[in-house]
């Protein structure tokens, strides 16, 4: 909440009277979020190593706003739980390529769709950048 005041003046022929008017506003907590695509490049079905990629997520929240950034299982989900969804890309006709998104560079913590598996942050009033780490297994 921001507070302030403004001075009021009244002029009359006989003299001047002044008073103070208090001014206030409540700032609602809010956030905006944006990201760039995670592009894995070319997949080789005979490769023995995973394909890795990253994407950035930029969140701007008002100062003090608590935010939880979660990720769904995507447009072509496989079986799995919200905590660790099986994510799949599709080329159509029932053909899928499994991938996963992680919240850490070691690619050991799945970025899920629940509070324990999402990424929490507190707004600072300026943009905060998070990195999402992706992997397509061999």
Summary of predicted features, one role per range:
Residues 2, 11-12:
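Cleavable N-terminal signal peptides
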Residues 7-9:
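N-terminal signal peptide c-region/cleavage motif recognized by signal peptidases
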Residues 13-91, 117-138:
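N-terminal small/polar-rich segments of proteins
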Residues 72-74, 100-104:
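Predominantly extracellular/luminal cell-surface or secreted proteins
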Residues 93, 105-107:
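Solvent-exposed strand-loop boundary residues in beta-sheet-rich modules
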Residues 94-96, 100:
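Amphipathic alpha-helical hairpins/coiled-coils and adjacent low-complexity
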């Amino acid at each position: 909440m921001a507070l302030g005041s403004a001075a009021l003046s009244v002029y009359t022929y006989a003299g001047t009277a002044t008073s103070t008017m208090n001014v206030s506003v409540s700032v609602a907590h809010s956030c905006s979020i944006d990201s760039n695509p995670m592009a894995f490049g070319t997949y080789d079905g005979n490769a023995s190593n995973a394909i890795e990629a990253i994407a950035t997520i930029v969140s701007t929240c008002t100062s003090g706003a608590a935010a939880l950034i979660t990720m769904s299982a995507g447009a072509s989900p496989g079986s799995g739980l919200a905590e660790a969804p099986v994510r799949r890309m599709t080329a159509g006709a029932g053909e899928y390529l499994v991938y996963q998104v992680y919240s850490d560079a070691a690619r050991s913590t799945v970025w899920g769709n629940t509070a324990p598996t999402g990424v929490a942050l507190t707004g600072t009033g300026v943009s905060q950048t998070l990195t999402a780490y992706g992997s397509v297994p061999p």
